[in-house]
Amino acid sequence: LSQNKHLIHLVKEMNNYIGPKSDPEGKGHKMICIDGNIYGLTHELDEYVDYWIIQSYGSSNPGFDGYGVDPKKIICTENFEKYATNGGQLLKQAAAMPREGYKGGVGAYRFDNDYDNTPNYKWMRQAIQINQRVFNEWKAKQNEAENKPQK
């Protein structure tokens, strides 16, 4: 993908209509998300993309570093075409945080397959709760650091 000049051109042109560059006043826009192997694309396209979706299939540590983008724009995902019955590594991905900052979120390919679990969407519900908890913990640490008296 990194050598795909046509894809890079397409995403930049799409930003005339959708994506972050289509909304210079910040009034709201339709998002552009790129899902897949994002290495090599992030440097040239980061300002044109709202979220990068990394396929962390089967990985308990999705790794947010090394892409050259702010981790808050990265959503890590598990493969529920394969792991819907046991959740795979989704809960560990939900708990994972980058070294600096926070992640954009967590998700799953074919999370509709989680519907048949008991309760419905068993793994996705837990992942959302875990993701929210670790974000709130991160935010509390940020607030604590900001309110700490300077010596």
Predicted segments, located by residue:
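Secreted glycan hydrolases and related glycan-binding modules that recognize and/or cleave
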Residues: L1-K151
